[in-house]
A protein has these predicted regions:
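Structural preference for solvent-exposed beta-strand-turn elements
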Residues: 1-239
């Protein structure tokens, strides 16, 4: 049996630079679709999923300008499509965040069922439950198509049957431009949920309670641009 032997007694010291949190970045970048203006996002981690999201946003019509290795400007005022290509969307698990962002901003979205890092079966039923509660009609197949009745989602009370980080973030994105107030009960509490809420609030959203099991989102008419720095990755810091 292989083993590691660790001899202690040597205090650690010094400094390291920690990358931006991956799980925050892969939600915040598609959340830029909700912004009616230019948003500058800093402390971007250098991972393939981020590069793919840049390509997807560009394909949808957004203007994506990479400023340096860790900063980007995204302008989604020129988005002309709510249907990212099958080949790109299915390559990353986090592509489901495009559903909440596009549905919230444009009232409809068609996104391929995601693949990517597949740690067993991770259904999106809680995402769909939240969208339907807010008045969306959702059909599922190789693609998930969601459309808001009347073109805009309505605030609703959403109780999560199981705690889901992805669903909490997706419903939060869908709700920021909805008509009325949305509450998410039994919400996930991870740091990247708080970071997404802070990003959206910095752009003009009204989200309270992120980081607790009850999140309240009061819908606003529009989000405007701004600058935001993604939190450091706690997993990288701990390892």
């Amino acid at each position: 049996m292989n083993k590691y032997i660790i001899h202690g007694g040597r205090p650690l010291f010094g400094e390291v630079t920690i990358s931006g949190a991956k799980n925050a970045a892969v939600a915040i970048i598609p959340a830029a679709l909700l912004v009616d203006g230019v948003c500058r996002i800093e402390n971007i981690p250098q991972i393939s999923d981020v590069t793919l999201f840049f390509s997807i946003l560009d394909e949808l019509g957004a203007r994506v300008r990479v400023l340096n290795q860790h900063a980007v400007e995204i302008d989604c005022r020129t988005v002309r499509s709510t249907h990212p290509s099958y080949d790109m969307a299915r390559r990353i698990r986090a592509s489901y965040y495009l559903l909440g962002a596009l549905l919230g901003r444009f009232g409809e979205a068609t996104v391929a069922m995601p693949g990517g890092c597949n740690f067993g079966v991770r259904p999106i039923d809680q995402h769909v439950k939240g969208f339907r509660a807010m008045g969306a009609e959702v059909t599922e197949g190789n693609f998930v198509h969601a459309a808001a009745r009347g073109g805009r989602l309505a605030g609703a009370n959403v109780y999560m049957d199981v705690v889901s980080v992805g669903a909490t973030m997706n419903i939060m994105m869908a709700a920021v431009l909805a008509d009325g107030t949305t509450t998410i009960e039994n919400a996930a509490k991870e740091p990247h949920i708080v970071d997404l809420a802070n990003f959206l609030n910095s752009m003009g959203a009204d989200i309270k309670g992120a980081g607790t099991d009850s999140i309240r989102i009061k819908g606003v008419e529009r989000l405007s641009g701004g600058t935001y720095c993604i939190i450091p990755d706690q997993i990288e810091a701990g390892t």
